[in-house]
Amino acid sequence: MDPRMHTAPPAGHPIQPGYQLEDNPYHHQQGFDIPAGPGRYSPGDALHIQTPQPIEGMGGYNAPGQHYTPDYAVNPEEHHDAYYNQPYEPQVGHDPYAAAPTPPVAGYQAHDDQRPMLMHTDSQVGQSDPYHDEPQPPTNNAPIKRWKTVKQVLLYRGNLVLDCPIPPKLLNQLPHGERDEFTHMRYSAATCDPSEFYEENFTLRQKLFSKPRHTELFIVVTMYNEDEILFARTMIGVFKNIEYMCKRTESKTWGKDAWKKIVVCVVSDGRAKINPRTRALLAGMGVYQEGIAKQQVNGKDVTAHIYEYTTQVGMTIKNDVVQLIPKQQPVQMLFCLKEKNQKKINSHRWFFQAFGRVLDPNICVLIDAGTKPGGSSIYHLWKAFDLEPMCAGACGEIKAMLGTGGKNLINPLVATQNFEYKMSNILDKPLESAFGFISVLPGAFSAYRYVALQNDKNGQGPLEKYFAGEKLHGGDAGIFTANMYLAEDRILCFELVTKRNCHWILQYVKSATGETDVPADLTELILQRRRWLNGSFFAAIYAIVHFHQFFRSDHSFLRKIAFFIEFVFQTVNMIFAWFAIGNFFLVFKILTTGLGDEKLLGTVGQILGVVFAWAYGVTLITCFVLSMGNRPAGSPRLYMGMVVFWAIIFIYLMFAAIYIAVVAIQTDVQKGLSFTDLFRNELFYTLIVSVVSTYGIWLIASLLMFDPWHMVTSMVQYMLLSPTYTNVLNVYAFCNTHDISWGTKGDDKPDKLPSVNTKDGQGKTDLPDEGDLNASYERELQVFSRKYVKPVTAPTSAQLEEKQMDYYRGVRSMVVLVWMITNFALCAVVLSTAGLERIDPEEGSQEQQTTKRATIYMSVVLWSVAVLSGFKFVGACWFLVVRMFRGV
């Protein structure tokens, strides 16, 4: 075996067999010692590394991978001890050129770039050859300069895998500098589908240690183009949870080395879509390096760029600027940068089918970038699985991010969503958890038992149903199925509980919380709820229709009865949701008509009723027309006007309900009605008791959960905007059932990357020179070191075209509205309907009034037709007379 394979390099330098990148080779040098940083080290943490080799002097050198038989290269696990168990044991050599020995420090201080890298004699280099210095690294403000960076790369198990040194500037700030997982970032170019990752011999670092690490918790953070603030917010929460578990020294599972059992996976949906500031933040943590990724390997397109690194860099947010904090708790990071934008469900395929199959974790935690888990929330989620062996999935409480001192509550939309989230977590989730089936575990913060997710031997099961949605988007799927898979997390929950011959349940963990930013803009809220409402509606129908699948499970008879009761409850709720818009109008009509009674508001009530009825109809028709033809972003003022109108309608209805009830009670009291007789008054019972019971249950339940503050800060806003949910959000959702998109645009084309072609397992490629590492690292730090200022850029041609189309759509919608409303007004006036009969009553019955108006209208129409026809006839006759005299 070649003694050069497992020799450790100076920090910040590539692990190479000692070949200088200049034209002249090295002088013969001896080895030297690397100062070891503080911390625990065990032979089990020794990590096999795969590194590029400089191309000069490659003659006569056999690649490290070629020292083994093909069986070793393809199946190293079968020869584990011989292949991996070679712990790091540096020796001090007698080097006449080496610097004076220095005491150990927290990190390796690589100030002298002239020291030799290895402690063996290179058989290919003569001792008389001179030694040449490397070029000096460029200054921080200069572009990355490429020295002689063409290097020989060796395929690992037939795949391109590179272990790249992290920048010395970063390494010098970190302890444990002697260990490969801290000194090197591992890059793998995946050229396959996620489902083929394991079969294509790809692996992950946790399986390459001399003692492979067991992954108890596998956390995925999915992101699209979130900025560095949102990403840092999530990572801060995740890191705090890992620190919390490392402090649980009395735990049988966790303790000071708990971080070795946790892997944090970040999956970014598209290389062209990732936010540059977020990418720079990942580089600052040591997880990402520019210039490493490849476009193709041997003609095969790279589908995902996988970076692995154990970071010791934490972060904090001050004044909207992310600041890095070195020497923090180690965290095993896995960053998957997908080449193309393929939606969130594809990101989960990489997580479950590719990485999950390699690591075989116990619990998988799903978090959206921007969601900040509480300091011990992930632990509490894990604890739910530990206490209940049959728990297949769990979720925590999703909280709306309210800002410092609750400043975001000033926005009524945020306050409304805060109240909505709170009541869902106080009433809905606990009820479903009591039955054992939660209709949806929110993808923003939830966890699953990996074993429960697996398909059966025929390839059928929860994951198969979950990932079926990826093939349906843009395919030949029916509209029902396509909309159903907008809420594929609901399908996953249903499939878990109904899994054949199993009895898995789902639980709600209130002590686990996750803060997420909610839409603060009406346009964003409409688009979000379109996806939620359509997905949940069609997924609920799917669950109800396929309820019989519960009987294929292994649940007890009592549990199945409980599921039946829960589904009856959900069916009733869905029926009410379907008829919500009609029920709201009927309540409006009954209350406004009642106010027109002579004992109440009389004529004033009648006039107000007619005005509001006409405004109601016009607003609702406007919403339908806009929903079917306009983008919310193209008509923001009209949508905001509708929200204001529905809030006014709600205030009027509340006034009507209270006023009618009070007058009715006063009348009964004057007749000597006792207090007990009040509950026999049908009007009082219908209006007052139902309203008080609803709001009373909200208050009592909130107090029982020790979480009542939303009743004070957000209840009024929620009540005022509740008609908007029925008459705007529902209307827009149902009018856009044809839209099965997630609201993302098509792919931007990313920059072209270099390719690698190999022969006999070896090839050449361009890689960043070590002299550029610090300069590149400094540049990445500068990207997010200042508060983000949105650049003022001229709109693109596509944006201008979209704006023009919004204008055209707006004009079109206004023309249609005027046309519809004027025709409706004509019919209402002629037939004396839509409340006009109450404003201008005439003698005689209603039928006689209608007949009289219709007769007059028909006379006007018929005489008008006759006059117009006569006018045309006169014109035709005049034409004939003129033609007779002109002869043409």
Curated annotation (Swiss-Prot):
EC class name: transferase
GO cellular component terms, semicolon-separated: cell periphery; cell septum; chitosome; plasma membrane
Enzyme Commission number, as recorded: 2.4.1.16
Annotated spans, Disordered: 1-41, 91-110, 121-144, 751-771
InterPro entries: Chitin_synth, Chitin_synth_fun, Chitin_synth_N
Catalytic activity: [(1->4)-N-acetyl-beta-D-glucosaminyl](n) + UDP-N-acetyl-alpha-D-glucosamine = [(1->4)-N-acetyl-beta-D-glucosaminyl](n+1) + UDP + H(+)
Cell compartments where the protein resides: Cell membrane
One GO biological process term: chitin biosynthetic process
Transmembrane segments annotated in the record for this chain: 532-551, 572-594, 607-629, 642-664, 684-706, 814-836, 860-882
Topology relative to the membrane: Multi-pass membrane protein
Family: Belongs to the chitin synthase family.
Name of the protein in question: Chitin synthase 3
Natural source organism: Neurospora crassa (strain ATCC 24698 / 74-OR23-1A / CBS 708.71 / DSM 1257 / FGSC 987)
